[in-house]
């Protein structure tokens, strides 16, 4: 079956959609990390002519809903009135077909759990799901994962912990995170996770993640940040460049080199963890290689090299597991009545070829993908997109 990416930021962006399609993804969930369209009806209408892959959307809390109600300060908690406004906007988005409310708590460190819980309860009441980019107060902070567990337990909502290895990029941190999540699961919490094939994460330079105080707390150095978009793409950060871009181009994406490689595979030692890309809105030749290489790398590293899982289990993680987790009854399987979304690949050669800006080509197509089909029609032949309008909007 076609691969299902539960955590991305395509949101109708064609260049990024083609990268997803070329690596075998046929369905992608956008609006993650608290960043999404607010007017879902208008967004869905804008996609009426089709897209590279099938798209499902969450409505985002931590950037989009907060900004829509006038909350521009990432360090200020919402008032009760602002929470009610966000609930009304989220309800409207879910009535239009959004799959739930997403959170990017790292990006609004001042938001109180009260508002998160309120939106979680709304999402649960409407049958939605809450992906959560957890809030890290330090690199070794486990309170962040407890917020995800509490959201599931207190709000009664299904929670998807986003890009697990980015949040907990050391093996011992993952052990602690798994222990806390499984404690909650044993008490009835419905929690799953997704994770990527890199520990080096990307975020906008102007976000709270890269505030100087937070960089000091996390012990990140300027020369560990690689610019991945814009006119300085491929350059390593300096203090002067940091100050210039924060002032003049805060949306510039940078990659923070952190974590340990062993954590990548270790994140998939639990059977409720599925692969994801965290792909952003990238113009050609720009961005993080995860947008072009994640799923092929998952198969190469976890199956062919490390033999951590066999082929049937790896395929399940990339197809049936996300379909069942998200409630996609016609996706993730090849059976009578299911949607004819599928990918044909060579298990001996499948691999990601993209690399970081300045070190390689961020959008290089993968190896080993023979063809990709959506709805019974061919979308990809080898490394060429032959039809980028087969994807449909999937409403909750």
What residues fall within each predicted segment?
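Divalent metal-binding pocket/active-site signature
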Residues: 92-148
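Divalent metal-coordination and catalytic microenvironments
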Residues: 7, 24, 55, 97, ...
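Metallo-beta-lactamase
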Residues: 2-10
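Acidic, glycine-enriched loop/beta-strand segments at the rims
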Residues: 255-258, 264, 306-315, 323-362
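Active-site beta-loop-alpha junctions enriched in small/polar residues
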Residues: 9, 13, 33, 60-64, ...
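Divalent-metal coordination cores built from histidine and acidic residues
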Residues: 8, 14-102, 189-191
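Active-site neighborhoods of metal-dependent hydrolases
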Residues: 58-59, 71-80, 84-106, 163-307
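C-terminal cap of metal-dependent C-N hydrolases
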Residues: 265-272, 277-278, 342-390
């Amino acid at each position: 079956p076609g691969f299902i990416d539960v955590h991305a930021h395509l949101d109708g962006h064609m260049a990024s959609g083609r990268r997803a399609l070329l690596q075998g993804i046929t369905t992608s969930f956008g609006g993650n990390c608290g960043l999404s369209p607010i007017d879902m009806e208008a967004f869905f209408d804008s996609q009426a002519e089709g897209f590279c892959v099938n798209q499902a959307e969450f409505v985002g809390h931590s950037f989009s809903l907060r900004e829509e109600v006038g909350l521009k300060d990432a360090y200020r908690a919402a008032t009760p009135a602002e929470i009610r406004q966000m609930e009304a906007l989220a309800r409207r988005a879910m009535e239009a077909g959004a799959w739930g409310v997403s959170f990017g708590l790292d990006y609004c460190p001042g938001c109180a759990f009260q508002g998160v819980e309120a939106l979680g309860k709304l999402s649960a009441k409407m049958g939605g799901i809450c992906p959560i980019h957890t809030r890290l107060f330090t690199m070794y902070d486990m309170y962040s994962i407890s917020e995800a567990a509490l959201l599931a337990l207190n709000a009664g909502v299904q929670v998807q912990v986003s890009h697990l290895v980015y949040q907990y990029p050391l093996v011992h941190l993952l052990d602690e995170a798994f222990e806390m999540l499984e404690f909650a699961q044993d008490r009835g919490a419905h929690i799953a996770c997704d994770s990527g094939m890199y520990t080096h994460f990307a975020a906008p330079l102007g976000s709270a993640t890269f505030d100087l105080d937070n960089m000091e707390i996390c012990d990140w150095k300027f020369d560990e940040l690689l610019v991945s978009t814009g006119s300085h793409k491929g350059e390593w950060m300096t203090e002067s460049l940091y100050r210039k871009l924060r002032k003049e181009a805060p949306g510039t994406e940078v990659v923070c080199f952190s974590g340990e490689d062993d954590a990548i595979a270790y994140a998939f030692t639990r059977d409720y963890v599925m692969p994801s890309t965290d792909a952003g809105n990238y113009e050609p030749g720009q961005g993080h290689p995860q947008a072009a290489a994640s799923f092929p790398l998952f198969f190469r590293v976890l199956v062919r090299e490390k033999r951590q899982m066999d082929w049937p289990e790896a395929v399940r993680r990339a197809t049936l597991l996300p379909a069942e987790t998200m409630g996609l009854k016609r996706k993730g399987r090849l059976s009578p009545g299911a949607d004819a979304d599928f990918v044909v690949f060579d298990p001996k050669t499948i691999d990601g070829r993209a690399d970081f800006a300045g070190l390689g080509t961020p959008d290089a197509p993968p190896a080993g993908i023979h063809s990709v089909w959506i709805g019974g029609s061919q979308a990809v032949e080898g490394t060429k997109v032959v039809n980028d309008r087969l994807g449909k909007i999937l409403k909750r």
